[in-house]
From Swiss-Prot:
Self-association state and partner proteins as the record states: Part of the 30S ribosomal subunit. Forms a bridge to the 50S subunit in the 70S ribosome, contacting the 23S rRNA.
NCBIfam families in the record: S15_bact (TIGR00952)
Domain of life from the UniProt record: Bacteria
UniProt-listed HAMAP family: Ribosomal_uS15_B (MF_01343_B)
Protein family membership: Belongs to the universal ribosomal protein uS15 family.
S-S bonds: none
Cellular component per GO, a single term: cytosolic small ribosomal subunit
Keywords: Ribonucleoprotein, Ribosomal protein, RNA-binding, rRNA-binding
Function: One of the primary rRNA binding proteins, it binds directly to 16S rRNA where it helps nucleate assembly of the platform of the 30S subunit by binding and bridging several RNA helices of the 16S rRNA. Forms an intersubunit bridge (bridge B4) with the 23S rRNA of the 50S subunit in the ribosome.
Protein name: Small ribosomal subunit protein uS15
Any one GO molecular-function label of the UniProt entry: structural constituent of ribosome
Organism for this UniProt entry: Pelotomaculum thermopropionicum (strain DSM 13744 / JCM 10971 / SI)
């Protein structure tokens, strides 16, 4: 469910805007997407895990808010990110 530090470093290296970038919206969305995908796989096996389902919904909402922020302020970066991540919209 949780990302290992190695997985997180890989995600950051793929989506960073500059060398020390760990907090840009692109990186945050990419990390959340990895966590969401991992948790989705967990929930396929453990259908009754409602606590994790609530966490998943919170993460999806947080990702949506970050994507809305990026869409409103930097539309080109937003389009590039959704294409790269393969998200709908």
């Amino acid at each position: 469910m949780a990302l290992t530090s190695e997985q997180k470093k890989n995600v950051i290296s793929r989506y960073k805007l500059h060398d020390n970038d760990t907090g840009s919206p692109e990186v945050q969305v990419a990390i959340l997407t990895e966590r969401i995908n991992s948790l989705t796989e967990h929930l396929k096996l453990h259908k009754g895990d409602h606590h994790s389902r609530r966490g998943l919904l919170k993460m999806v909402g947080q990702r949506r808010a970050l994507l809305n922020y990026l869409r409103d302020r930097h539309y080109e970066r937003y389009r590039a990110l959704i294409d790269k991540l393969g998200l709908r919209k």
